[in-house]
């Protein structure tokens, strides 16, 4: 009957478990739901239920992700767990399940492993704001010093990727022992509560979409006789009021200023439009042919047009509907960035990488044929001949 107590008044956060295969991410997810179920804050979700992750589609890519939800005294969480390493990469690059924070799981028996590094690097590239560490399987290590060494190693890794390695909370426990325990006072279960306290207090509450600077990708343009030009789209973030000054950004380096003289939704006039709304904005003094799909309407000074950037791109496998063959420098696909569809060229690959194979994820430098409104952490799709061949996230803007 725990369901009755669920309240929606608490702040909501999206969290995920990351780390190397078999280090205990899924076991920990199950243990968290079991520990919080004792307090009436969750429904216990067993390991098998989490491990059978349903398929989801994001930007044309199939990803296996499990979502569980639970609460603490302070917050409501949606927790994501992916069964396979490739699913993590695809999820983080497509942003299918956005993370406000992550729990990095590292087995005391192994320490930092290749996928541990890769997940931390990805978390940095896609701007996961904060991380809490759970050193798992400490029941299987006799030597306390070994656990200390693993902690040092993890802190160094986090610092290397620009997370505050010295400040990050590190909790040591055993997900399996906590899962097998049968009372909330068990010391292993207490470690799970300690972990959730760290998540509650260390992972910052995300800025609400409505508090961010206004941005709306332009999908369509209409001309209304006697009134002017209306652009439509879904507001990505922020709020727009009638009378606000905005910029039209993208498709050239010239940024045009105008004023929104009307906002309408479902043919009704509004005083304001907020993040998530599909609206039409009437623009003062802008001709129908002076604005195009692929540009964005944005708060002045909040976003700029760019042509060249670095991105982490996941290249779809043949089985996922992607390419059958590798590609090299000079490859020219289409980049779908918000509503813009622009040809771009792969101008640089990492040192030692000659070609990119289907199934790889690689940091590459892209140069578009014309500038688009771009920012770090932004997602996009790579398409060729009408099919998605990759998904990417902008990791650095060059020019």
Curated annotation (Swiss-Prot):
Keywords: Cytoplasm, Elongation factor, GTP-binding, Hydrolase, Magnesium, Metal-binding, Nucleotide-binding, Protein biosynthesis. NCBIfam families: EF-Tu, PRK00049.1, PRK12735.1, PRK12736.1, small_GTP. GTP binds at residues 19-26, 81-85, 136-139. Residues 81-84 are annotated as: G3. Mg(2+) binds at residue 26. The keyword Magnesium applies. Belongs to the TRAFAC class translation factor GTPase superfamily. Classic translation factor GTPase family. EF-Tu/EF-1A subfamily. GTP hydrolase that promotes the GTP-dependent binding of aminoacyl-tRNA to the A-site of ribosomes during protein biosynthesis. Monomer. Residues 174-176 are annotated as: G5. Its EC number is 3.6.5.3. Residues 19-26 are annotated as: G1. It comes from Kosmotoga olearia (strain ATCC BAA-1733 / DSM 21960 / TBF 19.5.1). It is found in: Cytoplasm. InterPro entries: EF-Tu_GTP-bd (IPR041709), EF-Tu_GTPase (IPR050055), EFTu-like_2 (IPR004161), EFTU_2 (IPR033720), G_TR_CS (IPR031157), P-loop_NTPase (IPR027417), Small_GTP-bd (IPR005225), T_Tr_GTP-bd_dom (IPR000795). GO terms for cellular component: cytosol. Pfam families: GTP_EFTU, GTP_EFTU_D2, GTP_EFTU_D3. Residues 136-139 are annotated as: G4. One of its GO terms (molecular function) is GTPase activity. It catalyses: GTP + H2O = GDP + phosphate + H(+). Residues 10-207 form the tr-type G domain. PROSITE patterns: G_TR_1, G_TR_2. This is Elongation factor Tu. Residues 60-64 are annotated as: G2. The gene is tuf.
């Amino acid at each position: 009957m725990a369901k009755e107590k669920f309240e929606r008044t608490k702040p909501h956060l999206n969290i995920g478990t990351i780390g190397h295969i078999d280090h205990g991410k899924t076991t920990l997810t199950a243990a968290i739901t079991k520990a919080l179920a004792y307090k009436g804050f969750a429904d216990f979700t067993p390991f098998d239920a989490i491990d059978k992750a349903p398929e989801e589609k994001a930007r044309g890519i199939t990803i296996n992700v499990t979502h569980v939800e639970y609460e603490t005294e302070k917050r409501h969480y949606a927790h994501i767990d992916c069964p396979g390493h490739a699913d993590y990469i695809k999820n983080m690059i497509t942003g299918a399940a956005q993370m406000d924070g992550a729990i990095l799981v590292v087995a005391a028996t192994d320490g930092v492993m290749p996928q541990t590094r890769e997940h931390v690097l990805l978390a940095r590239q896609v701007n996961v704001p904060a991380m809490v560490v759970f050193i798992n399987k400490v029941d299987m290590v006799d030597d306390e010093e070994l656990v200390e060494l693993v902690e040092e190693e993890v802190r160094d890794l986090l610092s290397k990727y620009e997370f505050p390695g010295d400040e990050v909370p590190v909790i040591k426990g055993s997900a399996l022992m906590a899962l097998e325990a049968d009372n909330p006072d068990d010391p292993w279960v207490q470690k799970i509560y300690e972990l959730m306290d760290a998540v509650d207090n260390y992972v910052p509450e995300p800025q609400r979409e409505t508090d961010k600077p206004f941005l709306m990708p332009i999908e369509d343009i209409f001309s209304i006789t006697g009134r002017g030009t209306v652009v439509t789209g879904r507001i990505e973030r922020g709020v727009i009021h009638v009378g606000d000054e905005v910029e039209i950004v993208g498709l050239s380096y010239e940024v045009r200023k105008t004023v929104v003289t009307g906002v309408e939704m479902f043919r009704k006039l509004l005083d304001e439009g907020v993040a998530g709304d599909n609206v039409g904005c009437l623009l003062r003094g802008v001709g129908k042919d002076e604005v195009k799909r692929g540009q964005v309407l944005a708060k002045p000074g909040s976003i700029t047009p760019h042509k060249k950037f670095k991105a982490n791109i996941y290249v779809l496998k043949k089985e996922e509907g992607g390419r059958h063959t590798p590609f090299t420098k000079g490859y020219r696909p289409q980049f779908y960035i918000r509503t813009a569809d622009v040809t771009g060229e792969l101008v640089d690959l990492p040192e030692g990488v000659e070609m990119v194979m289907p199934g790889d994820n690689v940091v590459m430098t892209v140069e578009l044929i014309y500038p688009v409104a771009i920012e770090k952490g932004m997602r996009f799709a790579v398409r060729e001949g009408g099919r998605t061949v990759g998904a990417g996230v902008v990791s650095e803007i060059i020019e």
